[in-house]
Amino acid sequence: MIIMVIIFLVLLFWENEVNDEAVMSTLEHLHVDYPQNDVPVPARYCNHMIIQRVIREPDHTCKKEHVFIHERPRKINGICISPKKVACQNLSAIFCFQSETKFKMTVCQLIEGTRYPACRYHYSPTEGFVLVTCDDLRPDSFLGYVK
């Protein structure tokens, strides 16, 4: 009986760990900040968000650039039904979808550091058309933006 309880707890822990990793890698977690976090010093927005969301490369180095989109997730999901369907650069078998309207975004450009979390970013608010790939009519990955 005790062994069954231990096995159950191990499986329960393992399942939750896998689900946490899946949540951490979603487009919404990585790129959507709506409403935009109110960081007291706007110039520190990127540094705050990169640490809070644990944004880094798989080898734990700093990302050179990262974009946060300041729009409702529902509106971002609507990109997948956009008539602006184009071939993705470097992904020949996959189509990209471009938003029909410009979204407010913050571009975080690495200015200092190489290993996470010792990364420092420049904050640059902008607007642009968002490019995503879609899976089952939901954005799957953020590919960039067009001004």
UniProtKB/Swiss-Prot annotation:
It is found in: Secreted. The keyword Secreted applies. One of its GO terms (molecular function) is RNA nuclease activity. GO terms for biological process: defense response to Gram-positive bacterium. Keywords: Secreted, Signal. Residues 1-20 form the signal peptide. Its main location: secreted. It comes from the Eukaryota. It holds the Pfam family RnaseA. GO terms for cellular component: extracellular region. Belongs to the pancreatic ribonuclease family. Does not exhibit any ribonuclease activity. This is Probable inactive ribonuclease-like protein 12. It comes from Homo sapiens (Human). The lineage of its organism: Eukaryota, Metazoa, Chordata, Craniata, Vertebrata.
